[in-house]
Amino acid sequence: MFLDAVPLEPYSTLKSQWSNKRIGRWRDRVAVPERETKQSMAAAALEVGARVRLAAGDFQHLLEALARRGYQVVGPTREDGQLIYGEIGKVADLPVGWTAVQEGGTFRLEPRPDQALFGYGVGQQSFKQFLWPPHQILWQVRREGGGWRLLPQAEEVPKFAFLGVRACELQAMAVQDRVFLQGVHVDPVYRGRREQAFIVALNCGHQDKGTCFCVSMGTGPKATTGFDLALTEVLQGEEHFFVVEVGTARGAEIIRQVPQRMADQQEIDAGDRVVAAMAGNMGRSLDPAGIKEALYANYEHPRWEEVAGRCLNCGNCTLVCPTCFCHTLEDAMDMAGTEGERRRRLDSCFTVDFSYLHGGSIRTSPKSRYRQWLTHKLATWIDQFGCSGCVGCGRCITWCPVGIDLTEEVRAIRETAAGAPKE
């Protein structure tokens, strides 16, 4: 039922001036110490599936290696007490030594007793905004003579390296690949950005259990596919290091430029224990078995009316969701009527106007709009795209102002299903 991430194709890259100089220095050496020889041989042998040890103190080298390849590194930063995805140029840009405590309608950052680089769960943003911009000009026209001329759109495709991509976010990208790349109409903006993106995944650990239920959805906490490199942060005693798994040839090319060595079995086991501990510490659970049929059979369940009485119809759940893609189109002209453009703007199915057709809106009640969102996310999405629209990240729970919990609503409907005593 769940869609695996689309494999990333290797792309050719030019050797940087730094790399050429470094190669020249190696060739000019008369003798190479035995330790360096072994390290270079191990680096040369790196291939997909290899796992290496990267000391936390050498993490800056990974950022620099990505920058040398022309990538704009984007990852979590701390801004105004929130986790925000922004440009990462140095390790200090990360929320080092912070953790995120979250529950329904609650999110706050608190200091940690250690210097973990990734000791927090997901914030309100996802990487969707970089692959599928919330505002986009689709085309522009100009009046010429007796007609209109379509103006070319020459957007320079940004080259992002996404840092700290959780397994649930990898699944969200795979879901959006199904929407924007594998349908009848391919989205050229999404395709260009997705093909360029370098993915540094992060296996979850060292964080508050929060509102996540990725284990229930089969999407985490360990990244299994769709990445160039995957990190597992290990803190044990005085040791602080990363076990880095190579996912693609591009990933191997980058990690070769970073001080590292092959991870031994004890280090690999330590990383596996971090992920296993996280898997056993989920904040929520949801049984996906038969969920589509349960929702279809309870379209008029009284729970829809009850949750509508709490829902503010603010659309927060759709804005923070890493897979929601509802949008609207707007046409605009200049005052002279000689130039115009069509814009795509992120929208929400919780707005009254979203379902507007000639004569009025179809979903006029909060009940109908919440039911549409939840049923689409967990049921009709499966019919439409062959996978669930929910990846279990828990953002919709955390960022709901009144703390509506998707997992609780589904459980309530199941426990009082059609034919059972009503609430």
Region spans (language model):
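Conserved hydrophobic/aromatic pocket- or pore-lining residues that grip, position, or stack substrates
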Residues: C321
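Iron-sulfur-associated redox domains of electron-transfer enzymes in respiratory
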Residues: P33-E34, K38-Y296, H301-W304, M335
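Ferredoxin-type iron-sulfur electron-transfer modules in oxidoreductases and energy-metabolism complexes
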Residues: P288-G309, H327-E423
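Extended amphipathic alpha-helical segments enriched in small hydrophobics
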Residues: A308-T318
